[in-house]
Every structure is written in structure tokens, then in C-alpha cells.
């Protein structure tokens, strides 16, 4: 009987420890800090997207997108770039820089994540991501 009681206490302690440590950093609220290209390699703070649903929507689009692992050379600096930041200043994480180029027809966007992940987005995903990040609309 004593062994059974001790095993129940041990299991209860393990469950408390596991649930206490399961606050994954990915569940923390984040915001998107956007900068716009204004001059040769110079960017200016443009927008801060703080709505958690919009941030999650952008993260979902990026996570569902298949990036190519290749180094690309663009003919001009990115039109915009953005990073995800935690709203809680005590959380430190390495930020990935996402750079956005708008196509000449303004119907698709090209994104480079970090140094070597490239994708071209068009259609609904491009329009949604661009609208949330910049507050502007792509031509549909």
C-alpha cells in the first residue's frame, strides 16, 4: 500500500513538473516589426503588427510555404523587411530577417528568409501576407 501511495505522489509530481515546463516559447505573443526601403540600403521603421491573430496568420503562411535553400542575388534592395519579436522583453530569441520584393506587376512577392531560403508567393497567400505586413494591398 505504501509503494502505491509513493508511486502516485511521484506521478503527480512528474505531471506538475512537465506541465510547468511546457510553456513553450512559441506560444508567447509576438509582433511583427516592419521596415520600408527609403534609400540605398537604408530602411525606416514602417509598421508594427501587434494583432496576435494576424501574426499567427503570417507565421502559418510562412510555415506552410516551401522555401528553396538557395542563395539568390536580387537586382535591388528589398522593398520591405520584417522580423518577429516577442512582446515579452524578457524572452530572447534569434530573429530571422524576412525580406520582401514586390514584382513589377504587383501581383506576387518574393521573400528571402535569413540568408539562403527563397520563395515566390502569389495569389491569396501573397495578398494576405502583404496586407498584414504592410497594410497595403497587392493587385489581385
Residue spans for each PLM region:
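Acidic/histidine-rich, surface-exposed loop or edge segments in extracytoplasmic proteins
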Residues: 35-44, 112-114
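Bacterial N-terminal signal peptides that target proteins for export
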Residues: 1-8
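C-terminal partner/receptor-binding element of secreted or periplasmic proteins
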Residues: 114-140
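Short, structured surface segments that line ligand/substrate-binding pockets
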Residues: 68-108
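C-terminal motif of bacterial Sec signal peptides marking the signal peptidase cleavage site
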Residues: 17-20
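Short structural boundary motif marking the start of a folded domain
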Residues: 26-33, 78-80
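Post-signal-peptide N-terminal segment of Sec-exported extracytoplasmic proteins
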Residues: 39-74
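Bacterial signal peptide processing site
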Residues: 22-24
Amino acid at each position: 500500500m505504501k509503494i502505491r501511495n509513493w508511486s502516485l505522489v511521484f506521478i503527480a509530481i512528474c505531471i506538475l513538473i512537465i506541465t510547468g515546463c511546457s510553456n513553450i516559447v512559441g506560444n508567447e505573443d509576438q509582433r511583427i516589426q516592419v521596415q520600408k526601403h527609403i534609400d540605398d540600403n537604408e530602411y525606416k521603421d514602417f509598421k508594427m503588427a501587434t494583432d496576435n491573430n494576424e501574426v499567427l496568420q503570417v507565421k502559418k503562411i510562412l510555415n506552410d510555404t516551401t522555401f528553396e535553400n538557395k542563395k539568390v542575388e536580387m537586382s535591388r534592395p528589398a522593398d520591405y523587411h520584417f522580423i518577429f519579436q516577442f512582446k515579452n522583453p524578457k524572452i530572447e530569441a534569434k530573429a530571422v530577417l524576412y525580406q520582401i520584393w514586390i514584382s513589377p506587376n504587383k501581383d506576387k512577392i518574393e521573400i528571402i528568409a535569413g540568408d539562403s531560403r527563397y520563395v515566390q508567393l502569389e495569389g491569396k497567400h501573397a495578398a494576405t501576407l502583404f496586407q498584414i505586413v504592410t497594410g497595403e494591398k497587392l493587385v489581385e
